[in-house]
A protein has these predicted regions:
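Phosphate- and other anionic-substrate recognition elements at nucleic-acid/protein interfaces
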Residues: 1-179
Length: 179
């Protein structure tokens, strides 16, 4: 049987907070790292995962949908062939992990670090569902098409503005020539 390690990732514009959970106990002191949300931070994550995950067979990363903020991290995960799942923020907001009384309560305190732990625990409790349908970024063609459609929309708006200006100028010139 594979020994799995579950990583919760709280993504923000500038930083990534990662926490891991092995399904047994939470190591509040050593199971968290905060890095920058860029290539230098991803390199630190790679070193940290290799260090903390040396006794594990598989890794599963989970994070909330945050739009563009997690796109580069997702590209990095896919380049390293890590499996990851995307979680709806509403599900995470309602998720309350079952913890022992002596452990810190995750439902009362709101920090990026605790959010990462909460996501890691969610990842462990839902790993079979996530593994059945892991997340993948769409193909590069999708992003190119999306950019082209946005450009087309912008050009259409600009064209309408120019036509309106031309109409206003023609109407103004006609009004003056009649007088």
């Amino acid at each position: 049987m594979d020994k799995e390690l579950f990583f919760g990732v709280d993504v923000s514009k500038k930083t990534l907070d990662l926490a891991y959970y092995d399904g047994e106990a939470i190591d509040w002191k050593n199971a968290h790292i905060q890095v920058s949300n860029d290539d230098a931070g991803f390199k630190k994550i790679g070193s940290w995962v290799a260090k903390v995950g040396k006794d594990f067979d598989t890794f599963l990363f989970c994070m909330e949908y945050t739009g563009l903020y997690n796109q580069n991290f997702r590209l990095w995960l896919e380049s390293k062939e890590y499996i990851y799942g995307m979680v709806e923020p509403r599900k995470m907001h309602r998720f309350e992990p079952d913890l022992d009384d002596d452990q810190r309560s995750l439902d009362r305190i709101k920090t990026d670090e605790l959010d990462a732990f909460r996501i890691a625990i969610y990842c462990e409790q839902n790993h079979k569902k996530i593994l059945r349908n892991p997340s993948k970024l769409p193909s590069p063609v999708y992003f190119k098409l999306k950019r082209l459609l946005a450009e087309r929309k912008q050009n259409t708006k600009q064209s309408v503005l120019y036509k309106q200006q031309l109409h206003d100028i023609c109407a103004y010139d006609t009004d003056l020539s009649v007088e």
